[in-house]
């Protein structure tokens, strides 16, 4: 499955390096204290529940970033429906590297697969209609790229990535601006000043009962 445009090499490297810094710090002392440095082992990622698999591509990047000598054999790809007991991939190499990256990889894949599965199931509910399922900015701080990537893998659509790539006026904007007319008028003026010659409007109808 192709990556969405916002999953860039730079973003991946930044995300992975920061996560490793947070978790590993100056070293995985439990592993270094108990596992020989030259030990080679084989590990399998076994699926624990039926789901839409997500995070395999990310897992490969994580393993390669930490230890380029690890060998990974992918058996299931992102977006595939997998069943309990299936093996997603196999990793062969330094036992220390595998153990140190194990939880980081599992955390990402568990969360991403859960999101992808929920997105897939929700899209199925509106299949055959004109309704589109979009995500939001209500994401985990510093994990947005991965969560939106999971939505994409699950078959739903990504909305704006951040505050910078799309204007979306909500009730708070309208209240502070003095009403929806004032808010929209000011926004149109702002866009013209910025050299934007077109706008897209959408109407959200919500049951506030």
Where do the language-model regions lie?
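Acidic/glycine-rich phosphate/pyrophosphate-binding loops and surrounding catalytic core
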Residues: 2-209
